[in-house]
Amino acid sequence: MKESINILAIESSCDETSAAVVVNGREVLSNIIASQISTHEKFGGVVPEVASRKHIEVISAVVQEALDEANFTLDDIDAIGVTYGPGLVGALLVGLQYAKGLAFATGKPLIGVNHIEGHISANFIEYKDLKPPFMCLVVSGGHTFIVYMKDYGEFEVLGETRDDAAGEAFDKVARAIGLGYPGGPKIDKISKEGNEDAIKFPRANFHNDTLDFSFSGIKSAVLNYLNKKEMKGEEINKADVAASFQKSVVDVLVDNTIKACMSKKVDKIAVAGGVASNSCLRETLVRECKKKGIEVLIPPFILCTDNAAMIGSAAYFEYIKGRRTSLDINAVPNLKLGER
């Protein structure tokens, strides 16, 4: 095998169009991201059809910019990695069809990547010496998992949400208290002005034999609290509501993740996904894990949100295992972690 494997990666699962050039799964030569946040902000959330159209408009330019920044041409690329699920089916298809076209035209192998595996692999970029096994908390707008990573590309899901994802709950609560979209960063910001102990919102407690999450109850409790306040004509302290809600979500995430580490006797937690940027989650996880002698690894913001560099990293580890993807692959919006 060549000393350096160069992956051109494409990501378009939701509302970011991204392309990157990644060498050997850990060195990022370029990571171009065209965000659609300002486009969807006026709608209060991502509109799938609008997202797809925006991807179509920019994907060619984004891929070319990624190659140019890396000072590469397609001749320098060994394989093309692309997200094929989970995500919005229309958005996924834009990136997938573009990648398939490149693979067909150049004869380069195609490697389909699970978006969640990409989030986990972002840690290999930031932490060059990181190797499995380790625990990973994946928290994003559409997904919440506790994953035991046994080896590269080998996962055991120990816990997952039974209803709303953590990021989805953040967005819905932010909308309810008038903060708008995107909800996660706005709740994080206003919470710094509030009292996290002002309101006691419930935590979902399942039996001890599961590490699953449930955030719909917390979300409903917030909505009920707001409705009661409005019916009584009482003033609502948005900062207190946001801080109390945030604490209830973070407490559950941290508690279950530490329990997972104890069950597998691992001393390393990696965090992945957009909600990993939340300052309360970062601070609480680091503080509580320190008490247990557990190391916490959290990538920088640019690698927490959707990006193609993480897809390039995951694609590399698939590539060296000899895995290749047929050009007749289709988008799988509900793709499960570990499915091939």
Curated annotation (Swiss-Prot):
BP GO terms, sorted: tRNA threonylcarbamoyladenosine modification
Reactions that this protein is recorded to catalyse: L-threonylcarbamoyladenylate + adenosine(37) in tRNA = N(6)-L-threonylcarbamoyladenosine(37) in tRNA + AMP + H(+)
Enzyme class: transferase
Residues annotated for Fe cation binding in this entry: H115, H119, D306
Annotated protein name in UniProt: tRNA N6-adenosine threonylcarbamoyltransferase
Organism taxonomic ancestry: Bacteria, Bacillati, Bacillota, Clostridia, Eubacteriales
Subcellular location as annotated: Cytoplasm
Short name of any one Pfam family annotated for the protein: TsaD
